[in-house]
């Protein structure tokens, strides 16, 4: 039986991701696989490649032939060089760098801390301020009461 290591396509239209599988060369692309040995997501930046090195080495040793794309993936991960006994077995796989956690600067905070209230000084200043306001409120009321009386006198 001719065994190949190839890609099995999954995902939506224009959003593919693949599984690296070992299957009979005569089966269809998305058919039944003998074994799944990895994953490949080409749309991520950098591309996500995860291949079980031990299983890939086993299948290559028993005669499984990788397709061109899988051979390129095996070279990136370093499995092909390890199988052939060449230098550079560590591969050139780039890993995604993790983003640093966001830390808001404390000194430039938008929300200002509450200041302690001084109750004694404002309390004294509020009482005199209220007294003239009450007097001013009473004065227009008195004038309003006098105004209708004057109108009544004029109309008689």
From Swiss-Prot:
Acidic residues: bias regions: 132-150
Ranges where the record places region Disordered: 85-156
Record field: compositional bias (Basic and acidic residues): 85-120
Keywords noted in UniProt: Ribonucleoprotein, Ribosomal protein
Keyword Nucleotide-binding: no
One cellular component term from this protein's GO annotations in UniProt: small ribosomal subunit
One Pfam match: Ribosomal_S16
Family indicated by similarity: Belongs to the bacterial ribosomal protein bS16 family.
Name of the protein in its database record: Small ribosomal subunit protein bS16
């Amino acid at each position: 039986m001719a065994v190949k290591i190839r890609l099995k396509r999954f995902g939506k239209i224009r959003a593919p991701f693949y599984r690296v599988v070992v299957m009979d060369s005569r089966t269809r692309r998305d058919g039944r696989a003998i074994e799944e040995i990895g994953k490949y997501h080409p749309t991520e930046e950098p591309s996500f490649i995860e291949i079980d090195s031990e299983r890939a080495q086993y299948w290559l040793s028993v005669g499984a032939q990788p397709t061109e794309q899988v051979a390129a993936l095996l070279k990136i991960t370093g499995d092909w060089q390890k199988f052939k006994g060449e230098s550079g077995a560590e591969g050139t796989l780039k890993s995604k760098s993790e983003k640093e956690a966001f830390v808001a600067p404390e000194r430039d905070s938008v929300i200002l801390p509450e200041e302690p209230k001084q109750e004694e000084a404002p309390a004294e200043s509020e009482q005199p301020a209220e007294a003239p306001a009450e007097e001013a409120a009473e004065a227009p009321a008195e004038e309003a009461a006098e105004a209708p009386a004057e109108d009544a006198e004029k109309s008689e």
